[in-house]
């Protein structure tokens, strides 16, 4: 089974049960993959909750995704991820840099994301 990473937006939609926001291709990949999130997704979820962009806490999202889909937080060493992220010059968004870098560092794993900038700059993006 393939390992795939979830971007923050996809994690939120899945936790909210809003599958209508996902494409058939994304849903198929979710069904057929072992799912991971970068720890940076947890941090971004916390930030989004703090600024009232989402109502669920980071912990609530991650617990729900783990219980329903078996999603785990990636435990890869952080230094090699950052070594990749410093070269992701296509974005100023530190969350996107690290999330993409986690997928790259794990054998160029697919990253399920609707983010247009990520889709343009990471060849293994699934949407």
Language-model features: where?
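Short acidic, glycine/proline-enriched helix-loop-strand junctions
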Residues: 62-75, 119-127
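Phosphate- and divalent-cation-binding pockets in alpha/beta enzyme and binding domains
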Residues: 44, 84, 120-121
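Alpha-helix capping/helix-boundary segments
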Residues: 10, 41, 81, 99, ...
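Residues at the C-termini of beta-strands that transition into short coil/loop
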Residues: 39, 77, 115, 127
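A structural micro-motif
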Residues: 33-34, 71, 109-110, 123-124
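Active-site neighborhoods of divalent-metal-dependent phosphate/nucleic-acid chemistry enzymes
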Residues: 57, 68-114
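Short, well-structured N-terminal submotif of metal-dependent ribonuclease cores
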Residues: 1-37, 51-64, 106, 116, ...
